[in-house]
A protein has these predicted regions:
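Copper-binding active sites and cupredoxin-like electron-transfer domains
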Residues: 1-139
Length: 139
């Protein structure tokens, strides 16, 4: 869709045979650094809390989310049910997938969360951007 909009704004017809190449990636409609200002795009919890994070990949590519400082447990997944029960710091999320992960906030601090798919941590090719946020654990 981004490609089509760029073509339309330049007065040319989009080529439907060209591959769609996204260049903006977001968390709850925010891209880094605004993800750090939006309470819906970051995780803020107290030390000792257990929180559940809902993840929905509505995009056209797979993503690999890396949670610094924590392992998250996969509680639900509509496309990868064999991963339920996994406890990892890096979780693959397929296009069209919805999942819920559980995080136990067992250490205070500020920890990054980002996509390991390098294009997804850019805004129109500029780093840093895109799918980067934080987990804030207050003591």
């Amino acid at each position: 869709e981004t490609q089509q909009m760029a073509s339309w704004s330049s007065g040319t017809e989009p080529d439907p045979t060209e591959a769609y190449v996204p260049n903006y990636f977001s968390i709850n409609e925010q891209t880094y650094p605004t993800t750090l200002e939006d309470p819906n795009a970051l995780v803020s919890v107290a030390l000792g809390d257990t929180c559940w994070i809902a993840i929905a990949n509505h995009g056209q590519m797979d993503h690999i989310l890396h949670f610094h400082g924590f392992h998250v447990e996969v509680l639900t997944s509509n496309l990868q049910p064999t991963r339920i029960g996994w406890s990892k710091d890096t979780v693959p999320v397929k296009k069209g997938e919805g999942m819920t992960v559980q995080l136990v906030a067992n250490q205070a601090g500020i920890y990054p969360v980002h996509d390991h798919n390098l294009i997804a941590v850019t805004n129109a090719g500029f780093y840093p951007g895109g799918m980067i946020t934080q987990i804030i654990v207050d003591p």
